[in-house]
């Protein structure tokens, strides 16, 4: 009798991706975040679908519809807060996943890495548009400030902004199209994730040592399925704890005030996961310069494979590179903190120094440390 798992057209793909997939025997818990991101994505799509059933994308009723979801819909409050905090968990896993990739040299799988950055950008766009939908003060002013950045583009900037707005200001047309894009983009993310996995399975997974592990592979199931399930349970536990005990911990109180174009909040800021990029944007006094720095803060990741100078792949045996990596991590935490602070001294100068250091570490310090370590390995 034929084994359906190995011979059926559809089951064969699933089998080769999640069951019989040859996996390095020594990958640590840092490799769990890929599956956790998958779980976050599924959770977001399901909760988002139920929210979309009750939400209305109209400036007059959007805020009221979110209130209605929380008050009148059965477990609407739970679905809404799972969706909001699920986004935070999504980005936490994303940042840890990218950090793992940098530390262990996974970026040398160029196609997988580039696909991952495209996924990051798409996810950031989706999250930004989702933040606009409740139509609170921070939603409205966040949308106004961020979309207005496009006006820094020479010649076509103003026309481009009005084209995105669908009006002469952030209004009903903007909210409707943001809702449409926020609904469709997660399905694009699912498709891009499949391409990401396709490229990954072409090369096989990296491992902590960065050494080729062709001779030491084990099947993905049951070893890593069990390990992933443990990670998933832990993630869901953290998410449920956050949602049930402190649902507004990571949100902004200003978003509980309905959007008012005549009243600007004292301090406009995005969600915590965008604060590092927002701090880099604000650190440059010139508008176009700030926008370019903001773009480069993400696009610089595309250059990681080109900036790799070390003869070793992973940082596990490279103490100098480890120091620069943790310096980068600390710098990103400082930028995140600065992004949440008002634009006044000493925050301005700290933000400028942290922004310079961010680019300096990636473009200069990391490649130089790789070269120094290469010379140190010569006996």
Curated annotation (Swiss-Prot):
Annotated positions binding a ubiquinone: 201
Drop me one GO molecular function for this one: metal ion binding
Entry binding sites for heme b b566:
97, 196
Q: How does it sit in the membrane?
A: Multi-pass membrane protein
Instruction: Look up the record and name the cofactor or cofactors this protein needs.
Output: heme b
User: What would be one Gene Ontology cellular-component term for the protein?
Assistant: mitochondrial inner membrane
Question: InterPro entries per the record?
Answer: Cyt_b/b6_C (IPR005798), Cyt_b/b6_C_sf (IPR036150), Cyt_b/b6_N (IPR005797), Cytb/b6-like_sf (IPR027387), Cytochrome_b (IPR030689), Cytochrome_b_C_euk/bac (IPR048260), Cytochrome_b_N_euk/bac (IPR048259), Di-haem_cyt_TM (IPR016174)
| Binding positions (heme b b562) | 83, 182
Which cell locations does it reside in? Mitochondrion inner membrane
User: Which terms does the UniProt entry file under GO BP?
Assistant: mitochondrial electron transport, ubiquinol to cytochrome c
Alphabetized, the UniProt keywords read:
Electron transport, Heme, Iron, Membrane, Metal-binding, Mitochondrion, Mitochondrion inner membrane, Respiratory chain, Transmembrane, Transmembrane helix, Transport, Ubiquinone
**Co-factor remark:** Binds 2 heme b groups non-covalently.
The cross-references to Pfam families, in alphabetical order and at most eight, read: Cytochrom_B_C, Cytochrome_B
Listed transmembrane segments? 33-53, 77-98, 113-133, 178-198, 226-246, 288-308, 320-340, 347-367
Tell me, what does this protein do in biology? Component of the ubiquinol-cytochrome c reductase complex (complex III or cytochrome b-c1 complex) that is part of the mitochondrial respiratory chain. The b-c1 complex mediates electron transfer from ubiquinol to cytochrome c. Contributes to the generation of a proton gradient across the mitochondrial membrane that is then used for ATP synthesis.
Assembly and interactions?
Answer: The cytochrome bc1 complex contains 11 subunits: 3 respiratory subunits (MT-CYB, CYC1 and UQCRFS1), 2 core proteins (UQCRC1 and UQCRC2) and 6 low-molecular weight proteins (UQCRH/QCR6, UQCRB/QCR7, UQCRQ/QCR8, UQCR10/QCR9, UQCR11/QCR10 and a cleavage product of UQCRFS1). This cytochrome bc1 complex then forms a dimer.
- Write down the PANTHER family for this protein, in alphabetical order: CYTOCHROME B
Query: What family is reported?
Result: Belongs to the cytochrome b family.
Q: What else is known?
A: Heme 1 (or BL or b562) is low-potential and absorbs at about 562 nm, and heme 2 (or BH or b566) is high-potential and absorbs at about 566 nm.
* Identification of the protein by name: Cytochrome b
What organism does the UniProt record list as the source? Hemiechinus auritus (Long-eared hedgehog)
